[in-house]
From Swiss-Prot:
<feature type="modified residue" description="N5-methylglutamine">
    <location>
        <position position="233"/>
    </location>
</feature>
<comment type="similarity">
    <text>Belongs to the prokaryotic/mitochondrial release factor family.</text>
</comment>
<dbReference type="GO" id="GO:0016149">
    <property type="term" value="F:translation release factor activity, codon specific"/>
</dbReference>
<dbReference type="Pfam" id="PF03462">
    <property type="entry name" value="PCRF"/>
</dbReference>
<dbReference type="GO" id="GO:0005737">
    <property type="term" value="C:cytoplasm"/>
</dbReference>
<dbReference type="InterPro" id="IPR004373">
    <property type="entry name" value="RF-1"/>
</dbReference>
<dbReference type="InterPro" id="IPR045853">
    <property type="entry name" value="Pep_chain_release_fac_I_sf"/>
</dbReference>
<keyword id="KW-0488">Methylation</keyword>
<protein>
    <recommendedName>
        <fullName>Peptide chain release factor 1</fullName>
    </recommendedName>
</protein>
<dbReference type="Pfam" id="PF00472">
    <property type="entry name" value="RF-1"/>
</dbReference>
<keyword id="KW-0648">Protein biosynthesis</keyword>
<dbReference type="InterPro" id="IPR000352">
    <property type="entry name" value="Pep_chain_release_fac_I"/>
</dbReference>
<dbReference type="InterPro" id="IPR050057">
    <property type="entry name" value="Prokaryotic/Mito_RF"/>
</dbReference>
<dbReference type="InterPro" id="IPR005139">
    <property type="entry name" value="PCRF"/>
</dbReference>
<comment type="function">
    <text>Peptide chain release factor 1 directs the termination of translation in response to the peptide chain termination codons UAG and UAA.</text>
</comment>
<keyword id="KW-0963">Cytoplasm</keyword>
């Protein structure tokens, strides 16, 4: 571990020198690239330097203890030594976590897609509930949300809806939401009071830069049409909605807000995210055949969570977490679930780094 930390610190110093180089300062791409790399290493270097300083301080105390017979001084030095010895294991654990390879998508904005699955109208209503839950969570984190495309249900909620979430670390917070979400409750239209089970699927796609995926203009088919709302009524009187089809894969992205220019930009953003996601999913499927992590495979069909309304209970099946806080969670208070999933992922990766042993 300490060899790795020495390499990280050395690279950090190299970046300091590079960021002082006039050639780099005058090259905006290099400046942005090196500045981001340095920022990513900053926390690790700070903690490692603090750790080394504590080790040196401890060595100095041990040396002073060997040179003094003064009882009062010995007692004081031993107290200082005990305090530092108690700190070191915590710093070591923090360094282990900081050395875990970071998901390259963690800092990115995301496209969230929610689709009503089994359960008819109730599934669509639940899809709307999930949309509201994520919107409230995003707001609490200082993220910005914007609807890209929505197909409303006649009885409330959405048949499907996609929206962007923008803000530093959006993907790191929402990536665990991939999968099938199940709700158990009595629908408002149910006169007999029977509990129904419905599902909605959630896909969280990191937004990608042009350099990460190449899309040729000749591979695109772009159509415009009039957007419609619930019940099929036309929302716009002009052909402002946009549908973009990627011909080689058949992947389609649409956006149906009021501005055709904005719709084209939004649809392209979604198309890039979906094509990138296809590529990532293929790689993950190969990897998942060798190993299944504690937080699941990320498969969209995998049931990840159940929301039980009669018992006010939410259960995340990947880590066996059950919380009797359904009301709070549906109001966007997802921190406890997301923190637990993040910790589970970190523990899993630490096991890998330690060859299966913590």
């Amino acid at each position: 571990m300490f060899d790795q930390l020495d390499i990280v610190e050395e690279r950090y110093e190299q970046l300091n020198e590079l960021l002082s180089d006039p050639d780099v300062v005058n090259d905006s791409d290099k400046l942005r690239k090196y500045s981001k790399e340095q920022a990513d290493l900053q926390k690790t270097v700070d903690v490692y330097r603090n750790y080394k300083a504590k080790k040196e301080e401890l060595a100095d105390i041990e040396e002073m203890l060997s040179e003094t017979d003064d009882k009062e001084e010995v007692e004081m030095l031993k107290e200082e030594s005990s305090g530092i010895k108690a700190e070191l294991p915590n710093l070591e654990e923090e360094l282990k976590i900081l050395l875990i390879p970071k998901d390259p998508n963690d800092d990115k904005d995301v496209i969230v897609e929610i689709r009503a699955a089994a359960g008819g109208d109730e599934a669509a209503i639940f899809a709307g509930d999930l949309m509201r839950m994520y919107s409230k969570y995003a707001e609490s984190q200082g993220f910005k949300t914007e609807i890209v495309e929505a197909s409303e249900s006649d009885h409330g909620g959405y048949k499907e809806i996609s929206f962007s979430v923008s803000g530093n670390g959006a993907y790191s917070k929402l990536k665990f939401e991939n999968g099938a979400h199940r709700v158990q409750r009595v629908p408002e239209t149910e006169s007999g009071g029977r509990i129904h089970t419905s599902t909605a699927t959630v896909a969280v796609l990191p937004e990608v830069e042009d350099v990460e995926i190449e899309i040729r203009n000749e591979d695109l088919k772009i159509d415009t049409y009039r957007s419609s709302g619930a019940g099929g009524q036309h929302v716009n009187t002009t052909d402002s909605a946009v549908r973009i089809t990627h011909l080689p894969t058949g992947v389609i992205a649409t956006s149906s807000e009021k501005s055709q220019i904005q719709n084209r930009e939004k649809a392209m953003k979604v198309l890039k995210a979906r094509l990138y996601d296809m590529k990532v999913q293929e790689e993950q499927q190969k990897y998942a055949s060798q190993r299944k992590s504690a937080v699941g495979t990320g498969d969209r069909s995998e049931r990840i969570r159940t929301y039980n309304y009669p018992q006010s209970r939410v259960t995340d099946h990947r880590i066996g977490l059950t919380l009797q806080k359904l009301g709070q969670i549906m109001e966007g208070h997802l921190e406890e679930i997301i923190d637990a999933l993040t910790l589970s992922e970190q523990t899993d990766k630490l096991k890998e780094l330690n060859n299966g042993e913590l």
